[in-house]
Curated annotation (Swiss-Prot):
Keywords: Cytoplasm, Nucleus, Protein transport, Transport. It comes from Lodderomyces elongisporus (strain ATCC 11503 / CBS 2605 / JCM 1781 / NBRC 1676 / NRRL YB-4239) (Yeast). One of its GO terms (molecular function) is proteasome binding. Residues 1-110, 385-416 are annotated as: Disordered. Pfam families: Cut8. Residues 392-412 have a biased composition (Gly residues). Residues 34-54 have a biased composition (Low complexity). The keyword rRNA-binding does not apply. This is Tethering factor for nuclear proteasome STS1. Residues 82-97 have a biased composition (Basic and acidic residues).
Length: 437
Protein backbone atom coordinates (compact mmCIF):
# COMPACT_ATOMS: atom_id res chain seq x y z
CA UNK A 1 0.00 0.00 0.00
CA UNK A 2 1.00 3.48 -0.70
CA UNK A 3 0.19 6.37 1.62
CA UNK A 4 0.56 10.01 1.01
CA UNK A 5 0.96 12.77 3.56
CA UNK A 6 1.52 16.45 3.42
CA UNK A 7 3.87 18.26 5.73
CA UNK A 8 4.38 21.93 6.09
CA UNK A 9 7.93 22.88 6.84
CA UNK A 10 9.19 26.36 7.41
CA UNK A 11 12.77 27.15 6.63
CA UNK A 12 13.89 29.82 9.00
CA UNK A 13 16.51 32.18 7.76
CA UNK A 14 19.57 32.69 9.65
CA UNK A 15 19.39 34.81 12.72
CA UNK A 16 20.54 38.36 12.52
CA UNK A 17 19.16 39.04 9.12
CA UNK A 18 16.85 41.91 8.36
CA UNK A 19 13.27 40.84 8.81
CA UNK A 20 12.13 43.35 6.21
CA UNK A 21 14.30 41.81 3.59
CA UNK A 22 12.21 39.92 1.13
CA UNK A 23 14.92 37.42 0.61
CA UNK A 24 15.04 36.76 4.31
CA UNK A 25 11.26 36.11 4.52
CA UNK A 26 10.43 32.63 5.64
CA UNK A 27 9.39 30.27 2.99
CA UNK A 28 7.06 27.38 3.41
CA UNK A 29 7.61 24.12 1.74
CA UNK A 30 5.03 21.50 1.11
CA UNK A 31 6.41 18.03 1.33
CA UNK A 32 4.52 15.37 -0.39
CA UNK A 33 5.51 11.98 0.81
CA UNK A 34 4.26 8.82 -0.63
CA UNK A 35 5.16 5.47 0.89
CA UNK A 36 4.65 2.15 -0.65
CA UNK A 37 4.49 -1.01 1.32
CA UNK A 38 7.33 -3.35 0.84
CA UNK A 39 6.68 -6.52 -0.94
CA UNK A 40 8.39 -9.78 -0.35
CA UNK A 41 10.20 -11.14 -3.34
CA UNK A 42 10.15 -14.53 -1.97
CA UNK A 43 13.90 -14.31 -1.42
CA UNK A 44 13.55 -12.88 2.02
CA UNK A 45 14.31 -9.35 0.93
CA UNK A 46 11.84 -6.60 0.77
CA UNK A 47 12.02 -4.03 -1.90
CA UNK A 48 10.58 -0.64 -1.82
CA UNK A 49 8.40 -0.57 -4.84
CA UNK A 50 7.87 3.10 -4.80
CA UNK A 51 9.00 5.55 -2.25
CA UNK A 52 9.63 9.14 -2.98
CA UNK A 53 9.05 12.52 -1.42
CA UNK A 54 8.14 15.65 -3.38
CA UNK A 55 8.69 19.20 -2.16
CA UNK A 56 6.37 22.00 -3.29
CA UNK A 57 7.24 25.56 -2.38
CA UNK A 58 4.51 28.27 -2.06
CA UNK A 59 5.58 31.79 -2.84
CA UNK A 60 5.34 33.96 0.29
CA UNK A 61 3.41 37.28 0.39
CA UNK A 62 5.03 40.55 1.17
CA UNK A 63 4.65 42.15 4.65
CA UNK A 64 2.86 45.12 3.23
CA UNK A 65 0.27 42.84 1.81
CA UNK A 66 -0.10 41.02 5.10
CA UNK A 67 -0.31 44.16 7.28
CA UNK A 68 -3.11 46.56 6.16
CA UNK A 69 -2.26 50.17 5.70
CA UNK A 70 -3.60 52.97 7.90
CA UNK A 71 -6.04 54.16 5.24
CA UNK A 72 -7.44 50.71 4.85
CA UNK A 73 -7.87 50.43 8.61
CA UNK A 74 -9.77 53.73 8.73
CA UNK A 75 -11.94 52.69 5.83
CA UNK A 76 -12.65 49.40 7.53
CA UNK A 77 -13.61 51.24 10.71
CA UNK A 78 -15.97 53.51 8.75
CA UNK A 79 -17.51 50.56 7.02
CA UNK A 80 -17.96 48.80 10.34
CA UNK A 81 -19.53 51.91 11.89
CA UNK A 82 -21.90 52.30 8.95
CA UNK A 83 -22.89 48.67 9.15
CA UNK A 84 -23.45 48.97 12.90
CA UNK A 85 -25.69 52.01 12.39
CA UNK A 86 -27.68 50.21 9.74
CA UNK A 87 -28.15 47.21 11.98
CA UNK A 88 -29.24 49.41 14.88
CA UNK A 89 -31.88 51.21 12.78
CA UNK A 90 -33.06 47.89 11.45
CA UNK A 91 -33.30 46.48 14.94
CA UNK A 92 -35.23 49.53 16.16
CA UNK A 93 -37.83 49.29 13.39
CA UNK A 94 -38.09 45.59 13.93
CA UNK A 95 -38.50 46.07 17.67
CA UNK A 96 -41.28 48.60 17.14
CA UNK A 97 -43.23 46.11 15.06
CA UNK A 98 -42.55 43.10 17.19
CA UNK A 99 -41.56 44.48 20.54
CA UNK A 100 -42.85 41.61 22.61
CA UNK A 101 -41.36 38.88 20.47
CA UNK A 102 -37.97 40.58 20.20
CA UNK A 103 -37.76 41.16 23.93
CA UNK A 104 -38.66 37.59 24.67
CA UNK A 105 -36.21 36.40 22.03
CA UNK A 106 -33.23 38.38 23.32
CA UNK A 107 -34.23 38.19 26.96
CA UNK A 108 -31.78 36.20 29.01
CA UNK A 109 -33.02 32.92 30.27
CA UNK A 110 -34.16 32.84 33.88
CA UNK A 111 -35.45 29.64 35.39
CA UNK A 112 -37.51 31.41 38.07
CA UNK A 113 -39.30 33.54 35.49
CA UNK A 114 -40.01 30.44 33.45
CA UNK A 115 -41.52 28.72 36.51
CA UNK A 116 -43.75 31.69 37.38
CA UNK A 117 -44.92 32.07 33.79
CA UNK A 118 -45.65 28.35 33.66
CA UNK A 119 -47.76 28.52 36.80
CA UNK A 120 -49.61 31.55 35.45
CA UNK A 121 -50.23 29.73 32.20
CA UNK A 122 -51.60 26.72 34.10
CA UNK A 123 -53.90 28.94 36.16
CA UNK A 124 -55.21 30.58 33.00
CA UNK A 125 -55.88 27.18 31.49
CA UNK A 126 -57.74 26.09 34.62
CA UNK A 127 -59.85 29.25 34.58
CA UNK A 128 -60.69 28.69 30.92
CA UNK A 129 -61.69 25.11 31.65
CA UNK A 130 -63.91 26.20 34.54
CA UNK A 131 -65.52 28.86 32.36
CA UNK A 132 -66.20 26.34 29.62
CA UNK A 133 -67.72 23.94 32.16
CA UNK A 134 -70.03 26.66 33.43
CA UNK A 135 -71.15 27.42 29.90
CA UNK A 136 -71.87 23.75 29.27
CA UNK A 137 -73.85 23.48 32.49
CA UNK A 138 -75.93 26.51 31.54
CA UNK A 139 -76.62 25.04 28.13
CA UNK A 140 -77.66 21.75 29.71
CA UNK A 141 -79.87 23.58 32.18
CA UNK A 142 -81.77 25.55 29.55
CA UNK A 143 -82.00 22.79 26.95
CA UNK A 144 -82.65 19.97 29.40
CA UNK A 145 -79.92 17.76 28.00
CA UNK A 146 -78.51 16.94 31.43
CA UNK A 147 -80.38 14.37 33.49
CA UNK A 148 -79.25 15.91 36.76
CA UNK A 149 -80.70 19.31 35.84
CA UNK A 150 -84.08 18.02 34.68
CA UNK A 151 -85.13 17.32 38.23
CA UNK A 152 -84.59 20.96 39.17
CA UNK A 153 -86.83 22.32 36.39
CA UNK A 154 -90.53 22.33 37.44
CA UNK A 155 -92.62 20.45 34.94
CA UNK A 156 -95.56 22.50 33.60
CA UNK A 157 -98.70 20.42 33.19
CA UNK A 158 -102.09 21.58 31.94
CA UNK A 159 -104.95 21.72 34.43
CA UNK A 160 -108.69 22.40 34.22
CA UNK A 161 -110.18 25.81 34.94
CA UNK A 162 -111.27 26.57 38.50
CA UNK A 163 -114.99 26.58 39.23
CA UNK A 164 -115.09 30.36 39.59
CA UNK A 165 -113.55 30.82 36.13
CA UNK A 166 -116.00 28.35 34.61
CA UNK A 167 -118.96 30.24 36.06
CA UNK A 168 -117.54 33.51 34.72
CA UNK A 169 -117.37 32.09 31.21
CA UNK A 170 -121.03 30.99 31.19
CA UNK A 171 -123.71 33.20 29.74
CA UNK A 172 -127.20 33.50 31.18
CA UNK A 173 -128.66 30.55 29.29
CA UNK A 174 -125.88 28.12 30.16
CA UNK A 175 -125.85 29.29 33.77
CA UNK A 176 -129.56 28.60 34.09
CA UNK A 177 -129.09 25.13 32.62
CA UNK A 178 -126.27 24.47 35.06
CA UNK A 179 -128.39 25.46 38.06
CA UNK A 180 -131.34 23.40 36.90
CA UNK A 181 -129.10 20.39 36.40
CA UNK A 182 -127.65 20.78 39.89
CA UNK A 183 -131.12 21.03 41.40
CA UNK A 184 -132.25 17.93 39.52
CA UNK A 185 -129.25 15.98 40.76
CA UNK A 186 -129.39 17.40 44.31
CA UNK A 187 -133.00 18.39 45.20
CA UNK A 188 -131.92 19.37 48.70
CA UNK A 189 -130.34 22.49 47.18
CA UNK A 190 -133.77 24.09 46.71
CA UNK A 191 -134.00 25.27 50.31
CA UNK A 192 -130.43 26.52 50.33
CA UNK A 193 -130.91 28.50 47.11
CA UNK A 194 -134.11 30.11 48.40
CA UNK A 195 -132.37 31.13 51.62
CA UNK A 196 -129.29 32.69 50.10
CA UNK A 197 -130.83 34.17 46.94
CA UNK A 198 -131.89 37.83 47.29
CA UNK A 199 -135.54 38.59 46.68
CA UNK A 200 -136.35 39.71 43.14
CA UNK A 201 -137.52 43.24 42.56
CA UNK A 202 -140.77 44.18 40.88
CA UNK A 203 -138.97 45.80 37.95
CA UNK A 204 -136.92 42.67 37.22
CA UNK A 205 -139.93 40.37 37.24
CA UNK A 206 -141.91 42.66 34.96
CA UNK A 207 -138.95 42.88 32.60
CA UNK A 208 -138.68 39.08 32.41
CA UNK A 209 -142.40 38.81 31.75
CA UNK A 210 -142.19 41.36 28.95
CA UNK A 211 -139.25 39.51 27.38
CA UNK A 212 -141.21 36.27 27.28
CA UNK A 213 -144.14 38.07 25.71
CA UNK A 214 -141.79 39.54 23.09
CA UNK A 215 -140.44 36.07 22.25
CA UNK A 216 -143.99 34.88 21.72
CA UNK A 217 -144.78 37.73 19.32
CA UNK A 218 -141.49 37.32 17.43
CA UNK A 219 -142.34 33.71 16.51
CA UNK A 220 -145.58 34.55 14.78
CA UNK A 221 -145.50 33.67 11.06
CA UNK A 222 -145.34 36.48 8.52
CA UNK A 223 -147.51 35.11 5.73
CA UNK A 224 -150.37 33.74 7.80
CA UNK A 225 -153.04 35.45 9.82
CA UNK A 226 -152.16 36.07 13.44
CA UNK A 227 -155.41 34.52 14.61
CA UNK A 228 -155.11 31.31 12.55
CA UNK A 229 -154.60 27.86 14.00
CA UNK A 230 -151.20 27.58 12.34
CA UNK A 231 -150.03 30.74 14.08
CA UNK A 232 -151.27 29.40 17.39
CA UNK A 233 -149.40 26.13 16.94
CA UNK A 234 -146.24 28.06 16.11
CA UNK A 235 -146.30 30.07 19.32
CA UNK A 236 -147.89 27.46 21.61
CA UNK A 237 -144.63 26.48 23.44
CA UNK A 238 -143.80 30.12 24.07
CA UNK A 239 -147.36 30.82 25.21
CA UNK A 240 -147.21 27.99 27.73
CA UNK A 241 -143.90 29.28 29.07
CA UNK A 242 -145.32 32.78 29.36
CA UNK A 243 -148.43 31.65 31.25
CA UNK A 244 -146.41 29.40 33.54
CA UNK A 245 -144.09 32.28 34.41
CA UNK A 246 -147.09 34.57 34.99
CA UNK A 247 -148.69 32.07 37.35
CA UNK A 248 -145.53 31.75 39.46
CA UNK A 249 -145.08 35.49 39.74
CA UNK A 250 -148.73 36.10 40.67
CA UNK A 251 -148.56 33.49 43.43
CA UNK A 252 -145.39 35.11 44.71
CA UNK A 253 -147.15 38.47 45.11
CA UNK A 254 -150.26 37.12 46.81
CA UNK A 255 -150.46 37.79 50.57
CA UNK A 256 -149.07 35.11 52.84
CA UNK A 257 -149.80 34.18 56.45
CA UNK A 258 -147.06 36.54 57.61
CA UNK A 259 -148.92 39.78 58.38
CA UNK A 260 -145.71 41.75 58.76
CA UNK A 261 -145.14 41.42 55.02
CA UNK A 262 -148.71 42.26 54.04
CA UNK A 263 -148.42 46.02 54.34
CA UNK A 264 -145.14 46.10 52.45
CA UNK A 265 -146.26 43.80 49.63
CA UNK A 266 -149.75 45.10 48.95
CA UNK A 267 -148.80 48.05 46.80
CA UNK A 268 -146.24 45.97 44.87
CA UNK A 269 -148.74 43.15 44.44
CA UNK A 270 -151.37 45.50 43.03
CA UNK A 271 -148.83 47.06 40.68
CA UNK A 272 -147.68 43.68 39.40
CA UNK A 273 -151.17 42.25 38.85
CA UNK A 274 -152.15 45.44 37.05
CA UNK A 275 -149.18 45.10 34.63
CA UNK A 276 -149.77 41.37 34.22
CA UNK A 277 -153.41 41.95 33.26
CA UNK A 278 -152.34 44.57 30.70
CA UNK A 279 -149.87 42.06 29.20
CA UNK A 280 -152.64 39.48 28.75
CA UNK A 281 -154.63 42.05 26.77
CA UNK A 282 -151.74 42.26 24.27
CA UNK A 283 -151.84 38.56 23.36
CA UNK A 284 -153.22 37.72 19.91
CA UNK A 285 -156.87 36.64 20.00
CA UNK A 286 -156.56 33.31 18.23
CA UNK A 287 -159.73 31.67 16.94
CA UNK A 288 -158.57 28.31 18.21
CA UNK A 289 -160.95 26.98 20.89
CA UNK A 290 -158.12 25.69 23.03
CA UNK A 291 -156.61 29.14 23.18
CA UNK A 292 -159.97 30.75 23.95
CA UNK A 293 -160.45 28.40 26.86
CA UNK A 294 -156.96 29.12 28.15
CA UNK A 295 -157.46 32.86 27.79
CA UNK A 296 -160.78 32.93 29.69
CA UNK A 297 -159.33 30.74 32.42
CA UNK A 298 -156.36 33.08 32.79
CA UNK A 299 -158.63 36.12 33.14
CA UNK A 300 -160.71 34.29 35.71
CA UNK A 301 -157.66 33.48 37.81
CA UNK A 302 -156.44 37.08 37.60
CA UNK A 303 -159.85 38.37 38.74
CA UNK A 304 -159.73 36.04 41.73
CA UNK A 305 -156.28 37.37 42.59
CA UNK A 306 -157.59 40.94 42.38
CA UNK A 307 -160.33 40.10 44.87
CA UNK A 308 -157.91 38.39 47.25
CA UNK A 309 -155.68 41.46 47.32
CA UNK A 310 -158.56 43.92 47.73
CA UNK A 311 -160.24 42.02 50.56
CA UNK A 312 -157.30 41.84 52.92
CA UNK A 313 -158.17 42.41 56.57
CA UNK A 314 -157.87 45.85 58.09
CA UNK A 315 -157.69 45.72 61.85
CA UNK A 316 -156.30 48.63 63.81
CA UNK A 317 -157.01 47.07 67.18
CA UNK A 318 -154.65 44.12 66.79
CA UNK A 319 -152.10 45.97 64.72
CA UNK A 320 -152.19 43.29 62.01
CA UNK A 321 -152.90 43.96 58.36
CA UNK A 322 -153.39 47.43 56.93
CA UNK A 323 -154.45 50.65 58.56
CA UNK A 324 -157.73 52.21 57.53
CA UNK A 325 -156.08 55.05 55.70
CA UNK A 326 -153.37 52.93 54.06
CA UNK A 327 -155.68 51.22 51.57
CA UNK A 328 -157.28 54.51 50.63
CA UNK A 329 -153.84 55.98 49.84
CA UNK A 330 -152.92 52.98 47.69
CA UNK A 331 -156.14 53.22 45.67
CA UNK A 332 -155.59 56.89 45.02
CA UNK A 333 -151.91 56.45 44.16
CA UNK A 334 -152.52 53.67 41.62
CA UNK A 335 -155.84 55.09 40.36
CA UNK A 336 -157.12 51.61 40.92
CA UNK A 337 -160.78 52.13 40.02
CA UNK A 338 -159.95 53.60 36.62
CA UNK A 339 -157.49 50.78 35.86
CA UNK A 340 -160.08 48.13 36.69
CA UNK A 341 -162.59 49.78 34.36
CA UNK A 342 -160.07 49.68 31.51
CA UNK A 343 -159.32 46.02 32.18
CA UNK A 344 -163.01 45.18 32.02
CA UNK A 345 -163.41 46.94 28.67
CA UNK A 346 -160.33 45.37 27.03
CA UNK A 347 -160.92 41.85 28.29
CA UNK A 348 -164.69 41.73 27.93
CA UNK A 349 -164.91 39.97 31.28
CA UNK A 350 -167.73 40.91 33.64
CA UNK A 351 -165.72 39.74 36.60
CA UNK A 352 -163.82 43.03 36.76
CA UNK A 353 -167.07 44.79 37.71
CA UNK A 354 -167.16 42.67 40.87
CA UNK A 355 -163.59 43.71 41.64
CA UNK A 356 -164.64 47.36 41.37
CA UNK A 357 -167.54 46.72 43.75
CA UNK A 358 -165.17 45.09 46.22
CA UNK A 359 -162.86 48.10 46.14
CA UNK A 360 -165.74 50.53 46.67
CA UNK A 361 -167.12 48.50 49.56
CA UNK A 362 -163.71 48.39 51.16
CA UNK A 363 -163.38 52.15 50.91
CA UNK A 364 -166.91 52.60 52.32
CA UNK A 365 -166.15 50.35 55.27
CA UNK A 366 -163.01 52.25 56.07
CA UNK A 367 -164.85 55.58 55.95
CA UNK A 368 -167.57 54.29 58.29
CA UNK A 369 -165.02 53.04 60.77
CA UNK A 370 -163.14 56.32 60.64
CA UNK A 371 -166.35 58.31 61.19
CA UNK A 372 -167.21 56.20 64.21
CA UNK A 373 -163.73 56.45 65.66
CA UNK A 374 -163.05 60.16 65.03
CA UNK A 375 -166.59 61.54 64.56
CA UNK A 376 -166.04 62.51 60.90
CA UNK A 377 -169.20 63.16 58.84
CA UNK A 378 -168.88 62.37 55.11
CA UNK A 379 -172.24 63.90 54.16
CA UNK A 380 -174.06 62.46 51.17
CA UNK A 381 -171.09 60.52 49.87
CA UNK A 382 -171.90 57.47 51.94
CA UNK A 383 -175.22 56.52 53.64
CA UNK A 384 -175.11 53.84 56.27
CA UNK A 385 -178.23 52.12 57.57
CA UNK A 386 -178.10 49.35 60.11
CA UNK A 387 -181.43 47.65 60.34
CA UNK A 388 -181.35 43.90 61.04
CA UNK A 389 -177.69 43.84 60.15
CA UNK A 390 -178.13 45.03 56.55
CA UNK A 391 -175.74 47.52 54.94
CA UNK A 392 -176.19 49.24 51.60
CA UNK A 393 -174.03 51.68 49.70
CA UNK A 394 -174.87 54.14 46.95
CA UNK A 395 -171.57 54.05 45.07
CA UNK A 396 -171.79 53.39 41.34
CA UNK A 397 -170.43 50.09 40.00
CA UNK A 398 -168.83 49.20 36.62
CA UNK A 399 -171.49 47.99 34.18
CA UNK A 400 -174.10 47.69 36.91
CA UNK A 401 -176.28 50.74 36.15
CA UNK A 402 -175.47 52.61 39.36
CA UNK A 403 -177.14 50.12 41.69
CA UNK A 404 -174.11 49.82 43.93
CA UNK A 405 -173.30 46.73 45.92
CA UNK A 406 -175.19 45.16 48.80
CA UNK A 407 -174.09 42.80 51.53
CA UNK A 408 -176.28 40.90 53.96
CA UNK A 409 -175.00 39.38 57.13
CA UNK A 410 -174.89 39.60 60.82
CA UNK A 411 -172.12 42.10 61.24
CA UNK A 412 -169.85 42.90 58.31
CA UNK A 413 -169.70 42.01 54.63
CA UNK A 414 -167.53 39.07 53.54
CA UNK A 415 -165.69 38.39 50.33
CA UNK A 416 -166.48 34.68 50.12
CA UNK A 417 -169.59 35.30 48.01
CA UNK A 418 -167.62 37.46 45.60
CA UNK A 419 -164.98 34.78 45.17
CA UNK A 420 -167.59 32.08 44.58
CA UNK A 421 -169.26 34.20 41.92
CA UNK A 422 -166.05 34.48 39.88
CA UNK A 423 -166.43 31.12 38.14
CA UNK A 424 -168.47 32.31 35.19
CA UNK A 425 -166.92 30.34 32.34
CA UNK A 426 -169.14 27.73 30.69
CA UNK A 427 -166.65 24.92 30.18
CA UNK A 428 -169.13 22.92 28.08
CA UNK A 429 -168.39 25.28 25.21
CA UNK A 430 -164.84 23.99 25.12
CA UNK A 431 -165.60 20.27 25.03
CA UNK A 432 -164.03 18.10 22.39
CA UNK A 433 -167.33 17.75 20.53
CA UNK A 434 -167.75 21.52 20.20
CA UNK A 435 -164.18 22.31 19.14
CA UNK A 436 -163.87 23.94 15.75
CA UNK A 437 -161.18 22.61 13.45
Amino acid sequence: MMSASFHWKHRSNEQGKNPLDKSAMPSSTLHYMSTNNSTNNGTGTSTNTSGSSSHYTIAPRSFSEMVPSQQQQQQNKKRKRYSDDDSETHNETHSENNNDTSQEQFKPHNHRDQTASGLLHLQQQQLQQQHSLLLLQQLHYFHGSSKTKRTKIPKIIGQPLPTSRLIESLDKTHLEKLLHSLIDIHPELNKTIQKITPKPSLENLLLILQDKHAQLIDHLPYKCSETSDYSYLRIKPYLQEFLSCLEDYVLYYLPSNNYSETKHKLIQSLKFIDEATSTIHKLPNFTNSEYQYMRNLTYEQLINCWLILVNQETNCDTGNGLDYTEFHKIVEELDLLESLKQHGVQSGQEGFSKVIEAVQNKLGQNQILLSRQFGIDYGNDMTVSSSNGNRSGTGAGFGGGGGGASRSGSGSGTSSNALSDMITVDYSLYSLSNRSV
